[in-house]
From Swiss-Prot:
It comes from the Bacteria. The phosphoenolpyruvate-dependent sugar phosphotransferase system (sugar PTS), a major carbohydrate active transport system, catalyzes the phosphorylation of incoming sugar substrates concomitantly with their translocation across the cell membrane. Involved in galactose transport with PtcA and Lmg_0963. This is PTS system galactose-specific EIIB component. Keywords: Kinase, Phosphoprotein, Phosphotransferase system, Sugar transport, Transferase, Transport. Induction: Induced by growth on galactose.
């Protein structure tokens, strides 16, 4: 079982799949055992409840759904899950190491 679970949410859950791969690679290179996955924003309620996938230790929104931050932040707070929006530059450049570091900062 993974030490930490990092969930990413975007419009369809597909555009973040490459970023997830890069984050997994960065985690492995640093000896971290994280489960990292991406889903659609439609799955946020289930993710925060741990239904259908492990409850995340942190939730990151893709920049294309940043407008949802206020709504999601309320739900995440109730669930006890820190969340934030991925920086557009890191997302656009697919900087898995930077996004992983941001997730780790939120978990600490």
């Amino acid at each position: 079982m993974a030490d930490k679970v990092i969930a990413l949410a975007c419009a369809a859950g597909m555009s973040t799949s490459l970023l997830v791969s890069k984050m997994q690679k960065a985690a492995a290179e640093n000896g971290k055992d994280y489960e990292i996955f991406a889903k659609s924003t439609a799955d946020i309620d289930n993710m925060l409840a741990g239904t259908g996938s492990p409850k995340p230790d942190v939730l990151l929104l893709g920049p294309q759904v940043a407008f949802m931050k206020g709504e999601v932040a309320k739900k995440a707070e109730i669930a006890g899950v820190p969340m934030d929006v991925i920086k557009m530059q890191d997302y656009g450049m697919m900087r898995g190491d930077k996004v992983l570091a941001a997730a780790e900062n939120l978990m600490n």
